[in-house]
Curated annotation (Swiss-Prot):
Keywords: Cytoplasm, Methyltransferase, rRNA processing, S-adenosyl-L-methionine, Transferase. The keyword Cell division does not apply. This is Ribosomal RNA large subunit methyltransferase G. Specifically methylates the guanine in position 1835 (m2G1835) of 23S rRNA. Gene3D superfamilies: Vaccinia Virus protein VP39. It is an enzyme of class 2 (transferase). Its EC number is 2.1.1.174. It is found in: Cytoplasm. The gene is rlmG. It comes from the Bacteria. GO terms for cellular component: cytoplasm. InterPro entries: DNA_methylase_N6_adenine_CS, rRNA_m2G-MeTrfase_RlmG, RsmC/RlmG, SAM-dependent_MTases_sf, Small_mtfrase_dom.
């Protein structure tokens, strides 16, 4: 892999999760454009800089030795990538203060560098939270590859930060540069809520939760077929989102012990709040993690999963395959993984390579529900 070279540093960077023969870089031309722009503006060791949505730590690792740096994002994998890339390049892990996107990064900040996320609701919430955190004369610069940079991103900068102009494209990347101006304190439209009829739940969704406006169709297909009356099993909702699968399963299985895990901090925050609303003080574990990587081997009896098929802008089944491997390792002998997936993804064949037996629980023209026994 090529080194990431800018006026600030020359770095050897990796993506997370790692895979053999990784074809993709841990940085892009938008990262380079942002850092070149900041270098031209000039920074000192006293400059207070906030980086948002730094996918694999390219921005933070470049700036860490030079400024007072805070990084914030909603991906725990992004946090792990930042730590690994700092260590990989001999940089102090304490040189970057990391704040999960479920919390507000406290300023004041002189410069804010933003990688525009796929979910514009996350960008909107992040810009809203910048109110009162910007130093006088601060500049907020958002960047992305032109093909992934919607016009609405510039509109959000204008609304919440101040006058904005778009740069020329360089290497198919573009900057959106906003100068901080007086704006009235905004009211956030997040979290959103929607009502589920069966089971009867009102589900809260923070800004970066998948399908925050309504139940996704895969989960809708899965819910009627969740196993019930299984006793005191140890179960996990893997990639829990707002927690709906885990909560619905818990309602059907009053003695079950639940763990809800997602790599999104906002998802875990949503799941925790939804659990309390539905189940009160019933114990459960909530964890932002790299799937079940932190789960002890053989410590679960059941894993429920509606696996994702994309990481940021990259589509594929790598993450799903990794979740299946993690579930197999975390399950005790005789334990089961239950999943829902699009028919065309061929999960049945993939699960057969990992598990003792695979059965189809239910299906419709678009989705299939499978259970795989260890």
């Amino acid at each position: 892999m090529p080194l990431f070279a800018t006026p600030f540093a020359q770095l050897d960077l990796i993506r997370q999760p790692e895979q053999d023969g990784e074809p993709l870089q841990a940085f892009d031309a938008a990262d380079e454009y942002l850092l070149n722009h900041l270098y031209e503006r000039g920074v000192t060791a006293q400059s207070r800089i906030l980086v948002l949505n730094d996918a694999f730590g390219a921005l933070a690792a470049s700036l860490a030795p030079h400024v007072q740096l805070t990084s914030s994002g909603d991906s725990h994998l992004g946090f792990l990538a930042l730590r690994k890339n700092l260590a990989r390049n001999g940089l102090d892990l304490g040189s970057v203060r990391f704040v999960p996107a479920s919390e507000t990064a406290v300023g004041p900040f002189d410069h804010v560098l933003v990688k525009v996320p796929k979910t514009l609701a996350l960008l909107e919430e992040q810009l809203i939270r910048l109110h009162g955190q910007l130093a006088p004369g601060a500049q907020v610069v958002a960047a992305g590859m032109v093909k992934h940079l919607p016009r609405a991103a510039g509109d959000l900068l204008e609304r919440y930060i101040g006058p904005m102009h778009a740069s020329l494209a360089v290497k198919k990347a573009r900057l959106l540069v906003a100068e901080a101006a007086e704006r009235p304190a905004p009211r956030s439209p997040y979290p959103t809520r929607y009502r589920l009829e069966q089971p009867p739940l009102t589900l809260l969704n923070h800004a970066n939760v998948f399908c925050r406006e309504g139940l996704d169709i895969g989960t809708r297909a899965f819910l009627p077929h969740l196993p019930r009356s299984l006793g005191a099993l140890r179960a996990a909702d893997l990639g829990c989102g707002n927690g709906v699968l885990g909560i619905a399963y818990a309602l059907l299985n009053p003695q079950a012990e639940l763990t809800l895990v997602d790599e999104s901090y906002m998802a875990v925050q949503s799941a925790r709040e939804n659990w309390r609303a539905a189940l009160g003080e019933r114990p459960a574990a909530f964890r932002a993690d790299d799937g079940l990587a932190g789960q002890a081997a053989g410590s679960l009896d059941l894993v429920l999963c509606n696996p994702p098929f994309h990481q940021q802008q990259v589509v594929g089944d790598f993450l799903a395959w990794r979740m299946f491997l993690q579930a197999r390792d975390a399950l005790a002998a005789g334990g089961e993984l239950w999943i829902v997936g699009n028919r065309h993804l061929g999960y049945h064949a993939k699960l057969k390579r990992l598990f003792r037996g695979v059965e189809q629980v239910a299906a419709n023209p678009k989705f299939v529900i499978l259970k795989a026994g260890k």
